[in-house]
Amino acid sequence: MSFIKETKKWYFIFLAVWTLIADVPFLFMLFTSFKTQSELLSGNTWQIPRQPTIGNFSTVLEGNFFTYLKNSVIAVSISVVLILIISSMAAFAFSRFKFALNNLLYSLIIAGMAIPIHVTLIPIYVLTNKIKLYDTVFALIGPYVALSLPMSIFILTEFMREIPLELEEAAKIDGCSMFRLYSDILLPLSAPALITVGIYNGTYLWNEFVFALVLTSSPTRRTLPLGIWDFQARYGSDIPAIMAFLTLSLLPMLIAYIFGQDKIIKGMMAGAVKG
């Protein structure tokens, strides 16, 4: 009994230390965003601001922040919706239909996870120019969706394969069509996996930098990760303003998590147990 208590004590100590370590970058970002440039350079980097100021946030909001935010919301939200629709349909086909090329097609799609996504930059750039989508927010949606599909299809297919076939057979006996089987039965049962896929892709695409850099050039077409450039000069950078920009960029994802944390945690836990 004492051994179990001792183990639990060290376990909680480890979690507390790990939480503190994980929070250090966030605390640095938050503290620095309320400092002036002179205070940051002259004082202790890690100390709490002596004279907190919201001037950095005012500077950020007076710039193009809301334009970058709008572009990010458009690109990410449309991409995630398309990813969920396409990957769930593909997973439904791979998990429920038996056809000649089922395993081959599924293997080819999964093999896409092994391809470094940035090797496609030049072909995508050339294609985007040819179809006149370069330097638009919509130029990002195609690559975002295509490059996210292999992992998404893999997660959803493996999840749907665990759903008992008896449910499908009972639905067919009751006259359920294939579309209703997909939309009314498998999709609700796959909600945990869909939530996991949505979180995974939404978080990654919100912070995606390279494709946004290559496929857009105008300041009015940039997404949030590119907006940091507004505070970088030739001989230095406004670090407090950059930290304020990052803090504001984090808020939408943080707010979404706060209001949906119950569903997110239940979905991810259920997905882990189901798999």
UniProtKB/Swiss-Prot annotation:
All residue ranges annotated as the ABC transmembrane type-1 domain in the record: 69-260
PROSITE patterns: ABC_TM1
GO terms under biological process: transmembrane transport
Transmembrane segments: 11-31, 74-94, 108-128, 136-156, 185-205, 239-259
Annotated compartments: Cell membrane
GO CC annotation, single: plasma membrane
Keyword Membrane found: yes
Membrane topology classification: Multi-pass membrane protein
InterPro entries: MetI-like (IPR000515), MetI-like_sf (IPR035906)
Keywords: Cell membrane, Membrane, Transmembrane, Transmembrane helix, Transport
Family of the protein in this entry: Belongs to the binding-protein-dependent transport system permease family. MalFG subfamily.
Protein's recorded name: Putative ABC transporter permease protein ORF2
Species assigned in the record: Caldicellulosiruptor sp. (strain Rt8B.4)
